[in-house]
C-alpha cells in the first residue's frame, strides 16, 4: 500500500517536472540555449542539456545535476524547481550580462564553454542577489524597453510641416514655366545650330543653282554648287577643289592641251570677287604652271618647239574669262579622247596616228560664259585618240620600233617585218635603252636594255656557267649582262604580245612612232632575239657612239657611261 502510494507520488512529481520543462523559458538549455534540455541543475534550479550537465559537474564546486527521465524527485526538489527555473536563474546569474558588450562564446568549443561557465558560476561575474534580482530585472526591462522605443521612433516618418513649421511657404510643383523656359530656349538654340550645320538640307533642290550667299566659313562646306560662284571673302576655302585649275603658263609645253592661265604661280585670282582670304585659292589648280622641263616628251630636240607651238593653240583665252564654264577643261579632255579616230585600224593602248596633232586637237573657244567645263579634257582625249595605223593592242609595227624612252633606228633587218602584218613579239625593240650605247651590226645584237657592251656569245643552255638570264623556250635569243660572263637568254617570240610604248600626245609620224620619239628616224621592229642591222642609235645620250660591239676609248658621249 505504501509502495503504490510512493509510486503515485513519483508519477505526480514527474508530471509536474514535465510541465515545467514545457514552459517557454525552460525549453532551451540555460547555459547554451540548446533545445530540449534533459537534465536539471539542482544547485541553481535550471534546466540544462546533456553536454552542459557534464561541464557543470566539472566546476568548483561541482553542481548537482539530475536527469529528468531517469531519476526521481522529492516534493522539496519539485518545489525548488517551481520557484526557480531558467527565467529566475537568468535574473540572478546573468543579471549584469549585456548581450551587446559581452561576447557569447562558441558552445561548440568545450574549452570556451568551460571558461564561460566559470565566469558565470565560480567568479559570479554577472551575479545579482536574489533579493535584488527582480529590481534589477525590472530596471533592465525598462532600459531595454526605452531603448527599443527610441530605436523604433528613430525611423518614424514625420510630416514635413512639423519640421518646417506652420509659416513655411507652400511648395508648388509642375507649375513653374520659368523653370521650363531655359530648357526651351536651349532646345531652340540647338535647333538653330543644327540648321547651320545641316549639309543635306537642300538635296531636293538644284545643286547647280546659285545659292544665297552666307557669311559663315562652314556655310558652304561640301556644297558642290558653290564652285567659283560666290565672293572669295565670304569663305576661307572659296576656291577649294576648283576644277578650272588644269592650266599652265602659256610658254610651257602642255601635256594634254589643258587651258592655261596668264597669272603667276600661287597668285590668287579674283573670279567671284576680291580675294580677302589667304586660303581663297586653296587647291586651285590654275595656280600650278608646269615648267617646260617637267613636260612629257621634252627630251626631243627637233619636236619640242613644234609641239610647244602646236599644242599651245589649245591654251586660249582662259585667263581673261572669269565667267567661263567650270567644266570646260573636262570637256576639252573629252574631245581629245574621242576625236580623230580615222585611220587604218583602231588601237587599244598605244596607237600611232598618221595625222599631226595640230589637225586633231580642236580648240574650243572660251569666249562665252556657257562653254563646256570639260573642254580641256576633251582636247586631251582628242590627242590620245588619234588615228591608228595598226590593230596591235599595244604598239604599231610599221617600220618603227617604239620604246618607252625613244625609238632605235636601224638600217635594215635580216627578217623584214611587214607594216601592220601582225602583232610584234614581246620586247621586240633591240637596244632601246637610251642610257646604254648602241650595239654593233653583228649577228648577235643584244636586246638587254641595261647592257653597255654586248658580246655575241653562243647560245647556252640551262646550267652553263654564265651570268645570263634564265633561258626560255623556243629559239634562243642572246642576252648578255654587262659583266664578262655571258650566256644565252632563250626567249621565245610571243606572237600575242608587243612592246609597251607611251601614247603619242604630239606630232604624229607617218609610220606611227611612239610617244617620245625625240625626232629620230623610224627603225624596223625585229623579234626579241633576231639580228638588228647596223644603224644609228636613237639614244639621245649616245649620239656619237661607235657601231662595234666593243667600243674603245672615249668614243661614247653618254654622260651616264
From Swiss-Prot:
GO terms for cellular component: cell projection; cytoplasm; cytoplasmic vesicle; neuronal cell body; nucleus. It holds the Pfam family ArfGap. SMART domains: ArfGap. Residues 176-191, 442-451 have a biased composition (Polar residues). Glycans are attached at residue 367. The modification Phosphoserine is found at residues 167, 181, 362. Its main location: nucleus. It is found in: Nucleus; Cytoplasmic vesicle. Residues 11-135 form the Arf-GAP domain. Keywords: Cytoplasmic vesicle, Developmental protein, Differentiation, DNA-binding, Glycoprotein, Metal-binding, Nucleus, Phosphoprotein, Repeat, Spermatogenesis, Transport, Zinc, Zinc-finger. GO terms for biological process: acrosome assembly; intermediate filament organization; spermatid nucleus differentiation. InterPro entries: Arf-GAP_FG-repeat_protein (IPR052248), ARFGAP/RecO (IPR037278), ArfGAP_dom (IPR001164), ArfGAP_dom_sf (IPR038508). Gene3D superfamilies: Arf GTPase activating protein, Longin domain. Interacts with EPS15R and EPS15. Interacts with FCHO1. Required for vesicle docking or fusion during acrosome biogenesis. May play a role in RNA trafficking or localization. Contains FG repeats. This is Arf-GAP domain and FG repeat-containing protein 1. It comes from Rattus norvegicus.
